[in-house]
Swiss-Prot record:
It comes from Mus musculus (Mouse). The keyword rRNA processing does not apply. Coiled coil: none annotated. The modification N-acetylglycine is found at residue 2. The gene is Srrt. Its main location: nucleus. Acts as a mediator between the cap-binding complex (CBC) and the primary microRNAs (miRNAs) processing machinery during cell proliferation. Contributes to the stability and delivery of capped primary miRNA transcripts to the primary miRNA processing complex containing DGCR8 and DROSHA, thereby playing a role in RNA-mediated gene silencing (RNAi) by miRNAs. Binds capped RNAs (m7GpppG-capped RNA); however interaction is probably mediated via its interaction with NCBP1/CBP80 component of the CBC complex. Involved in cell cycle progression at S phase. The keyword Oxidoreductase does not apply. Interacts with CASP8AP2 and ERBB4. Interacts with NCBP1/CBP80 and DROSHA. Interacts with LUZP4. Interacts with NCBP2/CBP20 and NCBP3. Interacts with MTREX. This is Serrate RNA effector molecule homolog. The lineage of its organism: Eukaryota, Metazoa, Chordata, Craniata, Vertebrata. Disruption phenotype: Death around the time of implantation. Deletion in adults leads to proliferative arrest and bone marrow hypoplasia whereas parenchymal organs composed of nonproliferating cells are unaffected.
Amino acid sequence: MGDSDDEYDRRRRDKFRRERSDYDRSRERDERRRGDDWNDREWDRGRERRSRGEYRDYDRNRRERFSPPRHELSPPQKRMRRDWDEHSSDPYHSGYDMPYAGGGGGPTYGPPQPWGHPDVHIMQHHVLPIQARLGSIAEIDLGVPPPIMKSFKEFLLSLDDSVDETEAVKRYNDYKLDFRRQQMQDFFLAHKDEEWFRSKYHPDEVGKRRQEARGALQNRLKVFLSLMESGWFDNLLLDIDKADAIVKMLDAAVIKMEGGTENDLRILEQEEEEEQAGKTGEASKKEEARAGPALGEGERKANDKDEKKEDGKQAENDSSNDDKTKKSEGDGDKEEKKEEAEKEAKKSKKRNRKQSGDDSFDEGSVSESESESEGGQAEEEKEEAEEALKEKEKPKEEEKEKPKDAAGLECKPRPLHKTCSLFMRNIAPNISRAEIISLCKRYPGFMRVALSEPQPERRFFRRGWVTFDRSVNIKEICWNLQNIRLRECELSPGVNRDLTRRVRNINGITQHKQIVRNDIKLAAKLIHTLDDRTQLWASEPGTPPVPTSLPSQNPILKNITDYLIEEVSAEEEELLGSSGGPPPEEPPKEGNPAEINVERDEKLIKVLDKLLLYLRIVHSLDYYNTCEYPNEDEMPNRCGIIHVRGPMPPNRISHGEVLEWQKTFEEKLTPLLSVRESLSEEEAQKMGRKDPEQEVEKFVTSNTQELGKDKWLCPLSGKKFKGPEFVRKHIFNKHAEKIEEVKKEVAFFNNFLTDAKRPALPEIKPAQPPGPAQILPPGLTPGLPYPHQTPQGLMPYGQPRPPILGYGAGAVRPAVPTGGPPYPHAPYGAGRGNYDAFRGQGGYPGKPRNRMVRGDPRAIVEYRDLDAPDDVDFF
């Protein structure tokens, strides 16, 4: 096994033997003379026998499984640690170890690494996607690392001592604003030509994208209304025990979205019948298997006697018929044999002809006599002509039969809800969607391409899904696309599996009446917000109302307020409470007063489910999962996953649980309910919003050049004029398209600027000095439950090398921003895989094992008085 402990420790031993080979040969010879049991003499035969017991002393917490090998009484000779050990390359570490090692270099398989500070190398390595680290993407230009914003303390060092505190704070705020503004402008210039960026912010592309999204939304709405009119939602409940019916409904929606008809929906019934037939067939086989051995011996004997009698009667009848059948069979066999003999003769003639043709090219072939060859060729030509005539007649007969079968084929329902798809993990940001479509269109059955949003932490690489018809051989297409490059980027597609669990459940507490009523309120609010945002039930601004088949108001929200108002019998409770009820201070004798039974209201649940299905089918929003599935119309599954209510909880629930569920659920829905955020006018001006008129004036001024007295040039056309006003007039008249381009560019930048959630590079914070709270026992950091993990993000540019004071996992390290949750940092020697955090340290504290990360087994020997008080400075 490649990942077993023995194999893994063997490779680690081999690694350190290679490191010592440059200066330890004399010591090895001495040890061999002393008769030490050294396994190096048997490189091939001794590999498997080399055990992890040789480093047993470095891991005292391990259990002994076998007797350790013999060693001499004297301690092993220690060697000096070389200065270059920290940066040594490890032949057994692949590029996969780098994100977890946290320190110096294993070999990288991507572009050649530049000379310079080791932290720059680490940062560049972590920024690359995995394909670049493995060599799939050639020659990626990493560019200059982004600048880091100064901390207030660093900023104060650049100021004069005469600047007071308030002025320093003001200047620092201005510095931060300028820094962010500059970063935003640099980001815009770096990505303005990329397709994903233009489709999001360029005025022309934004309009096209909105029209496409609106058309897809209208199509999904028509599908929902069609299914509702057909009664698909009448008896459908979003409970986990109705999973089969829910999947069938989702498939029906997908068939309708793909342009299917009512006839195509019949395939769902056929699939259901086939499944039931398969189940009944299996059940009948099991019953027969059980019933077979259950027959008694008496029954078997009786059956045997009856069979013998019947056989005796049949024997007489059969004897008279045997002669007739034998004759007929004999005649039939003779005819079949004749036909087979004729076919074989024809085949043999053809083979002989082919062989003779092939042999005629050989120098040593002996030709037959001319008369024989001519006669044979004439016969062969006749046979070929007859065969050709027969072949011509066959297609005509087939064509006559085709129209009869065509009517039956047209009626056959199509499985439009099933597709095949390929998944592409890394698509470079400079690759356009049209390029992928043109590449995949060459293969039959191509349907569509879906691209995910770019990921800033992965250099804005995107994931892609290419959908094909179900009838294609998807593995063959995947193989053909395997080694194709687009703009020096390997697509490396893989076959995308079908969804396994399309219906998933959440907590069954959602069946409670109080929660259902609250969900109706939230779902109605969500529908109202999404409909307004997409203007689904209103005509687009600036266009006359076009008569459509869609109603003017959402029929789903009709009379919804009837279910939002809770009816209470307050008067009755007041009268009963004041007259005969027990005082509220007195607790009941039995049961917990805070616990209640789960109360299910079928009427409310039916209303809620219709709202949730509207959200799922029309707006691609999974309510119980509190998430929106973006670009679902372009994905392989147009209606893939849905979350539903789980089974009813077996125990009583507390009132606090109900309130806590409602509170957390509303918090999760808040981002979906919020209107798209955009910067205010004041904030936009601070960030550098551009005025179109001013930018046009700048453009005209820059293209008005004075050559001399009364001599002005327009560089756009090369024409000369007597004055600047003539140049201006010329630009507006003859170069109006350039003016429009400037205005569009301004709108492009302003759209990006005003987006509060605009993409940006991951923020890299400066290294923080270690505080007293960071000095903890080895392996433990506040709020970090996983002491074995090391930073998976990138190291900041210019960060100093980690200090050497801590050999173990307790070394105090500067903070490394990763853009995610903080992780404890790698100890000294982490260039060899951060091994000390896994094995050494004498079992102090708990040491989780991880076989994927290999490292240094030579833990530092620690001397500690067990009776002394705790001291964190020991080695």
